[in-house]
């Protein structure tokens, strides 16, 4: 299970390239490195399950958190491709796309609509692993919501609140 990351400070990242790079390195580059090594080990074993935590922030990147969102978009794409590459190898990759999770990373922030708790995310992961799912949205309602969000014209999307 690959579960680490940083939200970072969007305002700071817009003027401090080192901070922006730190967010992207943590949320994308470091995860790609670990996933590549892990996948190779598990391919040789011909068995295993990999759980990767992306985010709905990467499904359609928003102005409010585009540094974090772009890193998660990259991770989401990498994990999707890796999951396809592992197909038939005995190794399963499950991509988890949580929405706003009330926890340490979001401490001090107002919860977004359809927020979840770490225990709700954990329960969804267990259900996904038990069912053989390749994608898990937490909460589930976010899947159809983001299907629609991807269809919105950029002029409307740009004005969307957090």
Region spans (language model):
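Alpha-helical segment proximal to the catalytic Tyr-Lys
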Residues: 40, 84-88
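Conserved mid-core segment of classical short-chain dehydrogenase/reductases
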Residues: 5-21, 64
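Residue(s) in the substrate-gating loop at a strand-loop-helix junction
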Residues: 55
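Active-site helix of classical SDR
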Residues: 35, 71
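Active-site loop immediately N-terminal to the catalytic Tyr-X3-Lys motif
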Residues: 60-66
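Rossmann-fold scaffold of SDR-type NAD(P)-dependent oxidoreductases
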Residues: 1-5, 52, 94
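C-terminal helical subdomain
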Residues: 95-96, 110-147
């Amino acid at each position: 299970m690959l579960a680490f990351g940083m939200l970072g400070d969007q305002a700071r990242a817009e003027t401090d390239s080192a901070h922006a790079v730190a967010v992207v390195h943590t949320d994308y580059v470091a995860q790609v490195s670990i996933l590549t090594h892990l996948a190779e080990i598990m391919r040789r074993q011909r068995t295993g399950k990999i759980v990767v935590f992306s985010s709905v922030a990467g499904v359609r990147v928003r102005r409010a958190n585009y540094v974090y969102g772009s890193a998660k978009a990259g991770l989401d794409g990498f994990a999707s491709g890796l999951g396809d590459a592992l197909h038939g190898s005995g190794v399963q990759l499950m991509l988890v796309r949580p929405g706003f999770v009330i926890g340490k990373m979001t401490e001090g922030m107002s919860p977004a609509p359809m927020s979840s708790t770490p225990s709700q995310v954990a329960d969804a992961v267990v259900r996904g692993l038990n069912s053989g799912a390749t994608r898990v949205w937490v909460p589930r309602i976010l899947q159809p919501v983001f299907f629609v969000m991807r269809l919105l014209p950029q002029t409307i999307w740009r004005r969307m609140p957090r």
